[in-house]
Amino acid sequence: MGVTKKPDLNDPVLRAKLAKGMGHNYYGEPAWPNDLSYIFPVVILGTIACTIGLAVLEPSMIGEPANPFATPLEILPEWYLFPVFQILRTVPNQILRTVPNKLLGVLLMASVPAGSLTVPFLENVNQFQNPFRRPVATTVSLIGTAVALWLGIGAALPIDESLTLGLFQSNLIQLSNIKIFQIFFFSYI
């Protein structure tokens, strides 16, 4: 790590260069307000114009038209909600008599971000350690990604095949995702 040398403002050569215009605006006019006050509105208005133009010239359907007489067997959410939908779908309705219906699924969904927030505190990171080499955080993120992909793919399948992804037959169709989340979150604590 080198030491930065500050310029000597009493130096006559440097003062001559500064007098000729070599300084903070040596490369031309300053970006603010001359350049940015012109470029920002042009870019923003151009983006809005392109979006409106594409919407007018090539309108796309928002979704299928509603038909109350042809309801699908299973209504699926958008693709990015598939893991959450799979958690709600596979958790049994009542495990204990005291827990109301689907409250356990909602608690499991809330445990995902809560468990993710605890990951930085699980690791005893030395201040001189490379922050990109965190084995616990890397392992948790890889396992979490695999579980999210597994839940997402399973949500698109029928309930009979959703837990095994149709790869093998299982007698335990109502296999609970609770075990997966217990393994995922509580094995590192």
From Swiss-Prot:
The chain crosses the membrane at residues 36-56, 103-123, 139-159. Keywords: Chloroplast, Electron transport, Membrane, Photosynthesis, Plastid, Thylakoid, Transmembrane, Transmembrane helix, Transport. GO terms for molecular function: electron transporter, transferring electrons within cytochrome b6/f complex of photosystem II activity; electron transporter, transferring electrons within the cyclic electron transport pathway of photosynthesis activity; oxidoreductase activity. SUPFAM superfamilies: a domain/subunit of cytochrome bc1 complex (Ubiquinol-cytochrome c reductase). InterPro entries: Cyt_b/b6_C, Cyt_b/b6_C_sf, Cyt_b6/f_cplx_suIV, Cytochrome_b_C_euk/bac. It is a multi-pass membrane protein. It holds the Pfam family Cytochrom_B_C. CDD domains: cytochrome_b_C (cd00290). GO terms for cellular component: chloroplast thylakoid membrane. It is found in: Plastid, Chloroplast thylakoid membrane. One of its GO terms (biological process) is photosynthetic electron transport chain. The keyword Hydrolase does not apply. Component of the cytochrome b6-f complex, which mediates electron transfer between photosystem II (PSII) and photosystem I (PSI), cyclic electron flow around PSI, and state transitions. PANTHER family: CYTOCHROME B (PTHR19271:SF40). HAMAP family: Cytb6_f_subIV (MF_01344). Belongs to the cytochrome b family. PetD subfamily. The 4 large subunits of the cytochrome b6-f complex are cytochrome b6, subunit IV (17 kDa polypeptide, petD), cytochrome f and the Rieske protein, while the 4 small subunits are petG, petL, petM and petN. The complex functions as a dimer. NCBIfam families: cytb6_f_IV. This is Cytochrome b6-f complex subunit 4. It comes from Pinus koraiensis (Korean pine). The gene is petD.
